[in-house]
């Protein structure tokens, strides 16, 4: 089973991103459980969307405490919550940031990092900082766990309040293309 925790802020589409990713994985024949994790947060407050998938039926309906992957659709959310809490060894981080890998502080459990300056792309496409579909493209590029084609099909099934289908398809593709993937080699303890 593979577990993903998506971090963002209220109003950025973290929950919608989880739903789109779940649909794309189902289209690829996976079993998926998606759990939005939010209460009465206001726009801008930290939110999370939780998703697990597998090749076989999933009976586990709990929160995700030890994710394989952390997808951050907001560059500042790590200042408000510990996005790395409980990550497994060999974890994947997919982060929206204009920073380089060397500028990030990563825990030793993180082995793969996908970086995408999604805010700049969002400002170009949407004229505001809505990064969810861009970061789904970044997730696909970084992990290889879902195809761009399945994400495109899932986006076509979605209902977007703030932007049109054409813009979101362009955002997905740009996120995929703009993502830099880094594998981190950690020295083995003696």
Where in the sequence are the language-model features?
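Active-site cofactor/cluster-binding pocket
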Residues: 1-190
